[in-house]
Amino acid sequence: MLSSRGGGALYDIGCYCIHASRYAFGALPKRVVGLIERDPKFGTDRLTSAILDFPGGQAIFTCSTQLVPYQRVHFLGTKGRIEIEIPFNAPRDRPTRMFLDETGDIFGSGIVTEAFDTADQYTMQGDAFSRAVLEGGEVPVPLEDAIANMAVIEAVFQSAARGEWVTL
């Protein structure tokens, strides 16, 4: 994939990290800082890390197209933590799991595990969009959400290029 055609870690994977962070905080970040390593052959970002500074805290993520596959979301708070296993492209052959730890025990005793039924989430998204179009209803996620996510993505690219925080 050539950079002139799009693609790369941030567009293809990091978009989900940004969306999950925006959803968790219920807001756009105030500012972002990013660091990008580009593939010398294709020019796309193959490794991207960013800090998103929200009014209520920070989100940090790393995404890559060329590292060993690993996918988790961790929410860390003052009273506990949540970990979601393979949240963005859930496997079809086993459930995605969420781990809730409200004990604060560093060894993880008392973690509650919840398994979600297997599903083809991309088909479900397409079906929901089709129903909204065919039946004249609202789409599950409005266009404004995609525009907001893209603003954050572009800010991460700008930050990496300039080597400084970018305010949204």
Language model feature labels by segment:
Residues 1-41, 163:
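Predominantly a Rossmann-like dinucleotide-binding segment in NAD(P)-dependent oxidoreductases
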Residues 9, 48-50, 71-73, 157, ...:
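Residue-level detector of beta-strand structural context in well-folded domains
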Residues 10-14, 119, 140-146:
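Conserved loop-to-helix N-cap of the C-terminal "lid" that shapes the substrate pocket in Rossmann-like
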Residues 24-25, 54, 133:
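A broad structural signal for alpha-helix termini and local helix breaks/kinks
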Residues 34, 45-50:
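Anionic-ligand binding region
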Residues 38-45, 54-124, 142:
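NAD(P)-dinucleotide binding in Rossmann-like oxidoreductases
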Residues 128-168:
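C-terminal helix-rich "cap/oligomerization" subdomain common to oxidoreductases
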